[in-house]
A protein has these predicted regions:
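Basic, amphipathic DNA-recognition helix from helix-turn-helix-like DNA-binding domains
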Residues: 3-67
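Conserved hydrophobic packing residues within short motifs/helices of P-loop NTPase cores
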Residues: 11-13, 98, 152
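Conserved catalytic core of two-component sensor histidine kinases
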Residues: 37, 44, 91, 124, ...
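Short coil-to-helix segment of the ABC ATPase nucleotide-binding domain corresponding to the Q-loop/switch region
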Residues: 41, 107-118
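Residues within the DNA-recognition helix of helix-turn-helix
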Residues: 46, 93, 126, 133, ...
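Short, Lys/Arg-enriched segments at the junction into DNA-binding effector domains
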Residues: 49-108, 112
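DNA-binding patch around the recognition helix
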Residues: 57, 64, 89, 134, ...
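DNA major-groove recognition helices of helix-turn-helix
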Residues: 97-98, 114, 137, 141
Length: 163
């Protein structure tokens, strides 16, 4: 589901109530986890809260092929990135990583997800190529690459875009 639409909220409903089951459900991609029995009013409240969060995190998509995230504009037609109106030149791979980040804004992604999203499922190289490209992107878009504010490291996990 996440591969088809990264800006969709997922609530897992389960009869399994052990803490380890809840942790596993959240780790595999659920945004929320509810155990049976539950009330319909609680489910509806959680759906409303999740929808607010997803709408806030989703990039502002415009009909002209541009994605907007904070001070950044990713123009999919010209394959250009702009920060505060200034053009930032990107390689093809860097552009694809940024596109993946914009579509998954606020979502922590493991290196393997980034590899699959950019290089495809058939790539069998080292996942460290993601780190190399992230380092290059940070040098291009961050005020201070050593203290990033946009491409954040999620320690022990991967990266998250904060537009």
């Amino acid at each position: 589901i996440r591969r088809d639409n990264a800006c969709i909220g997922i609530i897992m409903l389960s009869a399994k109530s052990l803490e380890s089951d809840k942790i596993k459900g959240l780790a595999i991609g659920a945004d929320d986890y509810m155990t049976k029995p539950f009330s319909i009013s609680e489910l509806l409240a959680r759906i409303d809260a999740l929808m607010r969060r997803v709408q806030r995190l989703a990039p502002e998509k415009q009909t002209d092929g541009r994605l907007v995230s904070g001070q950044f504009v990713l123009d999919q037609k010209s394959r250009m990135l702009y920060k505060n109106g200034e053009e930032i030149e990107l390689t093809q791979v860097e552009f694809q990583i940024m596109e993946l980040f914009f579509v998954n804004s606020g979502v922590a992604m493991v290196r393997e997800q980034i590899l699959q999203g950019v290089w495809g499922e058939g790539y069998f190289g080292d996942v460290k190529i993601v780190d190399v490209n992230i380092r290059r992107l940070r040098m291009k878009i961050e005020e201070e690459a050593s203290a990033p504010k946009h491409i954040l490291t999620v320690w022990g996990y991967g990266y998250r875009w904060n537009g």
